[in-house]
Each structure stands twice: as structure tokens, then as C-alpha cells.
Amino acid sequence: PMPAQNRVHPAARTAPLRVFVDNMTALNLAPCPKAPWAGGRVLRHIAYGDCSPAQWLNLYLPDTPLPAPLLILVHGGGFVTNDAESRQARLMYRFFRDRGYACATVNYRLAGEARFPAAIEDVKAAVRFLGQQGQTYGYDTGRTAIWGESAGAYLAAMAALTDDDTFAGTPCLGE
């Protein structure tokens, strides 16, 4: 049996969950509908690779004077669901767009289409593509950050923490 000092009282096990749910309810987070772009400029389904039709990104440019800092958003979904137009991506690009950031939402090959490390290859290819296109689209490549949610957080970390050659040497390696 577990020592008494390591046991968690049954009421304490549910307290964090209850606090989380109460806080989320207090925020009154209504679903984010697929509303039309309400400012700035949007460029949809820009191809950043040629391995798959899934290799695209959306670019949202603010109304503020360019070049704007760029935030790259990578969607979650456990590597098996969602895309660059997911609810999380819509919430984030709207938040940052309203504060003067350019946002790129990156789509990548899911596990049902390609094996590991395809998603990492795709996100890194998108980052390289975006790094080369700042003048074309009007964002500042010197002020770029990457952010992800769930599986997207893992992919963002891999893109940020691996050198440029890692997962880049063989095109379409994850097929």
C-alpha cells in the first residue's frame, strides 16, 4: 500500500478539475464561429511544400503598418485531427492580429497520411518558407515566434530547438 503521506484525499483529487472547469465557465468562452476575416488581409492555402496537398498555411496580415512581427501558429489535434483553420487557430490569430501581429497558421500532414517525422518536416518546411517570404508578404522575419497547442506545441518546440538541417535532408521523408 501507498504510505499515508503520499495518499491524496479523494476530495483533493477532483478539486483541480473543479477549479479548472469553474474558471473556464467564468470566462464564458463561447465557440468561435468561422466568421469572415474582419480586418487586415488574409491569404489562404499558400503552398509551402510539394509532398502533399496538406502542406499549406494561411497568412493573416494586420491593418497596422508593415512590416509586422510574425507569429507562427501550429494547431493541435493529437497528430490525427484538426487543421490550420481549427478553432484554436482562429482564436489565436484574431487575438494577435488585433494587436498588430502578422500570423501564419500552419497545416501539416496528419498521422493517417504520413508517418513520423512528417509533421515535424512540414512545420520546419513552413518555417523555412516563411523565413524567405517576409519581403513578399510584408512581415518582419527578424521578429518571428512560433507557438503551438497540444501536438502543435510539440511541433513548435521541435522546429525551434532542432537545427535547420534536422528533418530537412530528405524531402517527403515521412511518406
Where are these regions (language model features)?
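Short beta-strand element of the alpha/beta-hydrolase
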Residues: 67-77
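Active-site loop/turn elements of alpha/beta-hydrolase fold enzymes
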Residues: 76, 101, 108-110
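Short amphipathic alpha-helix adjacent to the substrate-entry channel of hydrolases
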Residues: 85-104
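Conserved catalytic-core motifs of eukaryotic protein kinase domains, centered on the activation segment
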Residues: 83-86, 115-116
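Primarily recognizes the serine-hydrolase "nucleophile elbow" in alpha/beta-hydrolase
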Residues: 125-175
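Serine-hydrolase catalytic-loop signature spanning alpha/beta hydrolases and amidase-signature enzymes
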Residues: 78-81, 103, 129
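N-terminal cap/lid segment of alpha/beta-hydrolase-fold proteins
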Residues: 9-66
